[in-house]
Amino acid sequence: MDQTPRRMLGQPLSSPATQPKKRSTSVMSFFSKVSWNLRLQKQEPLKNVFFILAETARDPSVKKRHMVMRGLGTMACETPDKVRKYKKIILDLLVHGLYDPVSSEVIHESMKTLTIILGKMQGKALGSFFIDITLQTRTLLDDENDSLRYSAFVLFGQLADLAGRKWKSFFTRQVKQTQDSLLTHLQDRNPQVAKACKTTFRACSPYLRQSKDYSFQNEEDQRNPKLCRQLVSERGQETFFQSLRSRCRCKAEGGRHTRELPP
């Protein structure tokens, strides 16, 4: 992740002393309008709501950008049929939020909403968005923020299930480049992140078996072609993960993560 300073999730966004109070009011007014439009779509076409969201998603205000991502998540839950109809517009907005250069809150909300929407779309008609989402999600697996890491592992595991035949080769390469992160965060000091990583590890195991490089050990260690066969075996899973704990202890100690996820 870039070195741009970020606020901790859950902390209120600070605002300059010169910032007018009117801005806060305008944010609330905007999303009251969006919420109202969701309930009264017959009075105002939903496409107008998307026009407002698209414009606001590029607003200089972090609060507005963050609330756009949250609003898209609400729309995905309340109007799933409309989400399918406008999926390209929605995905474009969410990918834009996923690459937000300033705010971890915007990125986090984008990932959470993408998880909802991809589940409803079942991976259909993702097109090149699949590449954009995968590349950015992979970079967030090692982020210092617990919530970002957690959501990134959840989303990456979902992408593993949705890759299909079209993106099989591409995703196999991405998983291979993610091996160190997967191994390290099996030992993540945040138990929720470690659990999400373990689930994603299993989802990625078919792609690991297709790779010629099966190793999850240090570079100087011997390659182990039995790794994935052991991983996907029901009997061997727990033994496998227990053995990994001792192997990657040194790596984990280099980047201990102790913060808890916000409720």
From Swiss-Prot:
It comes from the Eukaryota. The keyword Protein biosynthesis does not apply. It is found in: Nucleus, Nucleolus. HEAT repeats lie at residues 128-163. One of its GO terms (cellular component) is nucleolus. Keywords: Nucleus. Pfam families: HEAT_MROH2B_C (PF23227). Residues 1-21 are annotated as: Disordered. InterPro entries: ARM-like, ARM-type_fold, HEAT_Maestro, Maestro_heat-like_prot. This is Protein maestro.
